[in-house]
Amino acid sequence: MNVADISQAPEAYRDVVWIADTCKLIMGIGWTANYVGMIRKSLKDQTYAMALLPLCCNFAWELTYAIMYAFTTSLEKYVHFSGLLLNCGVMYTAVKNAPREWEHAPLVQRNLRLIFVLAVAGFASAHVVLAKQVGPELGQAWSAYACQLLLSVGGLCQLLCRGHSRGASYFLWFSRFFGSLVLVPQDIIRYTYWKEAHEFMGSPMYIWFVTIFLILDGSYGLCLWYVRRFEQQNPAAGKLKK
């Protein structure tokens, strides 16, 4: 969603808006591939690929901005509504397979469905409140940044805590990482050619977000490589993957 009315954009931005739209389309392709890959990987490995709370936060964001505060352009509507439909599949496989990962915590294992419902409701309320506070155009941007950081932290922690690579793959990591990374050049174009409407993209908060995102998601690839190597060198660790 554009944070400002595109009809008010300066001529300089309109000349390069196709580049920003291309970045948005590539983002949609990357995340679509990631969602499809997560569904397939979850069914194959009988687990969930995305950490639970980030998954609920992401699903709540899709609900909020695909239905309640729908995007304005046809491209954005298609990208995010298709993302919501695929995310339903991701949620289904997570709910189905999550109990297997929580045998060590019976209280959590017995109440996983309730946890999913409460988490989605809680995150959805946060997204809606933020949209009402600052407007849906700016709210979707800031809440998406929060979702991304939670996803990056959650994915890294899940990989390290599990100690195995079941539910993870280089394809899932790269499609997620690249699907989000490609929005950085989009934001640079918006800030460069339409600065008055995108001042926040030059703020310390935004620069911090991009930096932390690069560090966390870049670290995930390295950690996955290390875990895979550890599984190959230690038969006991390799059995945990099965």
Swiss-Prot record:
Pathway: Secondary metabolite biosynthesis; terpenoid biosynthesis. Its main location: membrane. GO terms for molecular function: lyase activity. Keywords: Lyase, Membrane, Transmembrane, Transmembrane helix. It is found in: Membrane. GO terms for cellular component: membrane. Pfam families: Pyr4-TMTC. Its EC number is 4.2.3.-. Diterpenoid pyrones display various biological activities and higginsianin A shows anti-HIV activity. GO terms for biological process: terpenoid biosynthetic process. The chain crosses the membrane at residues 16-36, 51-71, 78-95, 114-134, 141-161, 169-189, 207-227. It is a multi-pass membrane protein. Belongs to the paxB family. Terpene cyclase; part of the gene cluster that mediates the biosynthesis of the diterpenoid pyrones higginsianins A and B. The first step of the pathway is the synthesis of the alpha-pyrone moiety by the polyketide synthase dpchA via condensation of one acetyl-CoA starter unit with 3 malonyl-CoA units and 2 methylations. The alpha-pyrone is then combined with geranylgeranyl pyrophosphate (GGPP) formed by the GGPP synthase dpchD through the action of the prenyltransferase dpchC to yield a linear alpha-pyrone diterpenoid. This is Terpene cyclase dpchB. The lineage of its organism: Eukaryota, Fungi, Dikarya, Ascomycota, Pezizomycotina. The gene is dpchB.
